[in-house]
Amino acid sequence: MAFELDRSQILNVLRGFNPWWAGLPMNVPAFRRLAFDQCVRLLEDPKFKRAILLSGPRRVGKTTVLKQVAELLLAGRVEPVSVVYISLDHPLLKLASLTDLLRIYREDIFAEGKPAVLLLDEVQYAEDWELHVKTLVDHHPEYRILATGSAAV
């Protein structure tokens, strides 16, 4: 990190984005777009070793697809903390690197090396996001990654 961010503030933001970690219900629209089924199929395919990127204009439902995927995974009895949603356009999270955010997640929420699903919303706000995601795909097979982006992703 360029300067020391308050770890507890970052954890509070992450916990706010992931109410299922505390056993709280999700409020997600029932209508599912075509992209939902395609994302689920790829995430569940053990041979698929890439990140999935949903790109498109704002307000078309990309975030809803991410949250619906989380809801489906949680209904499948995965460990709730193994599913992490991070909105990278949050003012505080924009100050940290994606690597730092995932390190905090692994150190404070869910142990390193265990399988996890990363739901990265508005990924274009993370500096050098392409390199971070490529590194995660290449060196962390325990991660399944679904990211969204707007504008020039």
Question: Residues of each region from the PLM?
Answer:
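Phosphate-binding site recognition
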Residues: 1-153
